[in-house]
Amino acid sequence: MDSLLARVKRAADADALNPAQEGVTGGPDAAGLPDVSTSSPGGGGAGDKLKEKMDEYKDKLINEIENLPIWAIVLIIAGSLLFLVCCVYCVCRRSCRKRKKKEGKKGLKGAVDLKSVQLLGNSYKEKVQPDLDELPVNMEDNEDAESTKSEVKLGKLQFSLDYDFQKGELSVNVIQAADLPGMDMSGTSDPYVKVYLLPDKKKKYETKVHRKTLNPVFNESFTFKVPYAEVGSKILTFAVYDFDRFSKHDQIGQVQVPLNSIDLGRVVEDWKDLQSPDTESEKENKLGDICFSLRYVPTAGKLTVVILEAKNLKKMDVGGLSDPYVKIALLQGTKRLKKKKTTIKKNTLNPYFNESFGFEVPFEQIQKVTLIITVVDYDRIGTSEPIGRCVLGCNSSGTELRHWSDMLANPRRPIAQWHTLQEVPEKN
C-alpha cells in the first residue's frame, strides 16, 4: 500500500514538472500569454493616438485662419497687442504703488514727534524759530538788495537840436537808440519814438517803427514852431515805445530836455540815458485806448470798420465812470459823407462793443477820404462830451497812418490795432 502511494506521488510530480518547463522554453505563444513588450494597455499606442488628434486640430485651426478675411486677422492681432499692453501697464502700476508705499514708510520713520519737541523747552525753540522782531529788518534789507538788482538799464538815445532864431523854429533830429531792453517774447523789440513839447503837447511826431531790433537807427527830423519868448518854458520829450499791433504799446523809457538848460546858439548833439516814465508822462494816455479793425475790398469799393472795445477811458461822470459810445465819421476834405455810431454802454470805463459798420468808398476815392473815430460820453440831460478820437487816412501820421497803410496793403483782410485817444480840438 505504501509503495502504491509512493508511485502515484512520483507520477503527479512528473506531470507538474513538464508543463512548467514548456512555459519557460516555449515563449509567450506556447504559454498563451500576451506579448508585454509590444502591446501594453497604457503604452505607446495611446500616445500615438493623442499626437494624431493634436495634429488634426492644428490642421483645422490653420485652415480656419487661412479662410478668415484680412480685417479679422488684423483685429485679432490688435486685440492681442492691446491685451499685452494692458498686462504690462498693470504690472508697472502695481510695482510703482509698492515703491511709493516703501518710500512713504521710509519718510514716516524720519517724522518728528511734536510732543518730544515741546518737552525740549525754549532752548530748542530759540534755535529753530528766531525772534520775530529781527525778521522785518532782514526782510527790508533783502528788499533793498533786490531793488538794486532789479534796476535795469533802459538804453540810451542820440539826438540833435538846431534852433532857427529868425523863423522861430526848433529842428529836432532823432538819430538812433542803443541797448534797448527786449520787450517781446523773442527778446527783441519793435521800437519807435514819439517827440513832443511839454506842457501843451499840441503837436506830436512819431518816427517809423523798426522791427526786431534793440539798436534802431532812425535819422528822422521834425520841426516845431516855438517863438523865442516861449522857449524857456518848453520841455522837449522823447518817448520810446515798443510797437504792438494787438495790444497797448509799452513805453520803454523817455528823455526830457528842458530847453532853458541848453545853448540854442549852436547845434546840440548828445546821448541821453532813457529814464522810467514818471506819473506825469504816463498821464499822456489819460483819455484811454480804443481797438478797432479796418477792412477794404477794392473791387466792391467797401470799407468795413469793426469797433471792438475801449479801455481805461477818462472818468467823465461824478460817480467816476462814463457812459461811452463811439461815433464813426467818413469825410472827404471838409465834407462829411457818412456818419454812424455804436450803442451806449452804461457805467463803464472799459466798454466792449464788437459792432460792425460798412461804408461805400470807390477805389479812386480811398486815397482822399478821412476816417474819424470819436469816443463820446453820453449825457441824457446836458450835452454829450467827447472823450478822445483817432483820425485815419493818407494824411494822418504815426500809428494811425500805419494802420491805414496796412489796410490798403492787405485788401479783403481785417487789420485790428489799438490806438491811443487824442484830444478833440474845440470848435470855434
From Swiss-Prot:
Residues holding Ca(2+) 3: 244, 247-248, 250
Residues spanning the membrane: 68-92
Effect of mutating residue 123 to A: Loss of phosphorylation by PRKC2
Domain of life: Eukaryota
Stretch list, region Disordered: 16-50
Cofactor note: Binds 3 Ca(2+) ions per subunit. The ions are bound to the C2 domains.
UniProt keyword terms in alphabetical order: Calcium, Cytoplasmic vesicle, Membrane, Metal-binding, Phosphoprotein, Repeat, Synapse, Transmembrane, Transmembrane helix
GO molecular-function term, one example from the UniProt record: phosphatidylserine binding
Cellular localization per UniProt: Cytoplasmic vesicle, Secretory vesicle, Synaptic vesicle membrane; Synapse
Membrane topology of the entry: Single-pass membrane protein
Residue numbers on the Vesicular membrane side: 1-67
Amino acids binding Ca(2+) 2: 184, 242, 244, 250
Amino-acid positions noted as binding Ca(2+) 1 in the UniProt annotation, renumbered to this chain: 184, 190, 242-244
Residue span, C2 domain: 153-272, 286-419
Annotated segments matching region Phospholipid binding: 147-395
SUPFAM superfamilies: C2 domain (Calcium/lipid-binding domain, CaLB)
Complex and partners: Binds SNAP25. Isoform 3 binds SNAP25 with higher affinity.
Family: Belongs to the synaptotagmin family.
Function: Acts as inhibitor of neurotransmitter release. Overexpression leads to a decrease in the amplitude of the excitatory postsynaptic potential in dissected cholinergic and glutaminergic neurons while depletion with antisense oligonucleotides leads to an increase. Overexpression of isoform 1 blocks the reversal of synaptic depression by serotonin in sensory neurons.
Listed name of the protein: Synaptotagmin-1
Organism of origin: Aplysia californica (California sea hare)
Name of the gene encoding the protein in the UniProt record: SYT1
